[in-house]
Amino acid sequence: MSLTDPQTRYVNFYTDFAFKKLFGTEANKDLLLSFLNSCFEGTEHFLDITYLNTENLGVTATERRAVFDVYCETEKGEKILIEMQNGEQQFFKDRSIFYSTFPIREQAKQGKSWDYELKRVYTICFLNFTFDNDSDFTHTVKLVDMTTGKVFYDKLSYLYLEMPKYNTPLTEESSLYDKWLFAIKHLGDLDERPAELREAIFNRLFEQAEIAKYTPVERQDYEESLKNFRDWYSCLITAVRKGRAEGRAEGREEGRAEGRKEGRAEGRKEGRAEGRKEGRAEGRKEERLSIARNLKASGTLTISQIAMATNLTEDEVEKA
């Protein structure tokens, strides 16, 4: 994760301001259209997109509200959701599935005869964290028949991009898709546009991303967005490091105590092994609790956000 200095030449794509300016405004929809077509090259080609209201309400007043980063519609009426997620959340996959239900449900024709035919819905998620230690950085997800291994329903698609895993070298032979991913990941760290990004669309990208060309209001908005991004990241890293240290210390102590207890009852060898196993488990749990306590003390995140970041329940965070 880059923590770009606010005086660098180009904006940090991971900030809320930059992401929505470059991918979520009518003036820059050619940038998003180019990226989308690079994602689906060989399977789909979009001629135009129309931006839609990013705030969606449930069918009833009591249902939860969904706020998308970018929400648009193709010339065929297909819906596309684009999200930038900087922090790991316990139920992020669930949330992305939940969000995709809104474009589905809004297609229902109220008060009319309807045959249930649906337009395609695409969800694209940029992740500034990783799901696991697997080397694959991209995950294309559809409804699949587990018996045959074939796609059962192809109108609902999810593309998850684990950006920390993306380390493909940039060359002149790189695909447009790879060039876009490189630009998105490294934009805030660059002083010049790389020669490999020679396509005209990247001229547009770097023009729109150059901080010096912003109005005073835009520059202030960006710097505030960058500050929030840096504060959040710094707070999270500090809490994680402190929590890990405290968790390891408590885990070792509990492991030794449990090992001695089990050793007396069932023999030293088995007791030590069991003690180490339980101690590691307790240590990991205590590490998460310690991180939660540190995040609560910082006052920068809500209980719900802390729970998502630490894989704890909100009740556990409250009691931490």
Specify the residue positions occupied by each region the protein language model found.
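Elongated, amphipathic alpha-helical interaction scaffolds
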Residues: 1-320
